[in-house]
């Protein structure tokens, strides 16, 4: 046994046939783990859109948002509501709120238009599924993305079956590919553990999602799977790689999975761009002793020049 595998069992992460080029547009939707990967891509100034309406957790919520984005029109009514003087939308997280129905509607339509345009031109879409638990409004049985701390008695909670998850994801995939036939879709299951449902129920949820994703990938060759869940649970496999809450992956684990993600989905040219940009990031995040000194200002100006040269070199837009 080699030294590199002595204390771990490596999870295979096959290389994609359609790797991300430096100038490619990418979309990340789903749980907080999607946000973690999106944060890395944003830090390297890649063309990425991540959860424009907030965090999403289950296949039904993600599919519903995509459907509304692709069918977004000025005339379409959105599921908005008011609480304590503020207006919210059942398709979005709590960070999107307005002082009137008109304001929240305009905000949501702008976000949906942003997502629609991105889906039309993006080369890659990454969807991270967190759970199969779904919440619906009792009054009309409609799916909600976020409960917005509203009374529990206005919702019903249900666990989507493997068949329901599969059908939902396949319908979503068909709709996406009819809109953008060149879109590469990657599904992954979040390694975050949903303790609020109990660990047994969490495992059932993850198993349900994994079985559904397997069926979708088998049915549609355009869809691939990235094993973030397996990397944390089967390869890293240690509480050292969890945050203080023992539920979220630690920054070290996220960084490791990011590296594995890059190996699988980034082209050699993109990985070279990331390596070169890393040097600029180190300079930009350096804490100087005298930030107002002429020397430091010249240092920052030089970094900005290198940054612009690097972006032009790899064909990245501003």
Q: Where on the chain are the PLM-derived regions?
A:
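Extracellular glycan-modifying ectodomains
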Residues: 1-318
């Amino acid at each position: 046994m080699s030294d590199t595998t002595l204390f771990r069992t490596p999870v295979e992460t096959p290389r994609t046939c359609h790797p991300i080029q430096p100038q490619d547009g990418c979309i990340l939707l789903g749980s907080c783990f999607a946000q973690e990967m999106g944060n890395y891509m944003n830090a390297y100034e890649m063309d990425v859109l991540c959860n424009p309406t907030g965090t999403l957790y289950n296949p039904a919520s993600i599919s519903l948002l995509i459907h509304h984005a692709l069918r977004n029109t000025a005339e379409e009514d959105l599921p908005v509501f008011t609480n304590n003087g503020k207006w919210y939308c059942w398709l979005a997280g709590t960070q999107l709120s307005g002082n009137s129905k008109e304001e929240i509607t305009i905000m949501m339509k702008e976000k949906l238009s942003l997502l629609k345009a991105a889906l039309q031109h993006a080369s890659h879409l990454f969807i991270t599924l967190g759970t199969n638990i779904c919440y619906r409004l009792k009054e009309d049985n409609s799916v909600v993305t976020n409960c917005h701390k509203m009374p529990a008695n206005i919702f019903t909670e249900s666990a989507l079956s493997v068949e329901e998850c599969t059908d939902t994801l396949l319908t979503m995939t068909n709709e996406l590919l009819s809109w953008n036939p060149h879109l590469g879709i990657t599904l992954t299951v979040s390694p975050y553990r949903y303790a609020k449902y109990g660990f047994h129920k969490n495992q059932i949820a993850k198993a349900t999602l994994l079985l559904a994703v397997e069926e979708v990938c088998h049915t549609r060759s355009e869809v691939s799977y990235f094993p973030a869940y397996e990397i944390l649970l089967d390869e890293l496999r240690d509480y050292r790689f969890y945050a203080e809450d023992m539920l979220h992956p630690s920054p070290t684990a996220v960084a490791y999975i990011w590296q594995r993600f890059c190996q699988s989905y980034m082209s050699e040219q993109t990985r070279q761009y990331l390596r070169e940009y890393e040097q600029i990031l180190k300079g930009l995040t350096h804490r100087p002793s005298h930030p107002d000194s002429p020397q430091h200002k010249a240092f920052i100006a030089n970094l900005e020049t290198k940054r612009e040269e690097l972006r032009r070199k790899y064909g990245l837009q501003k």
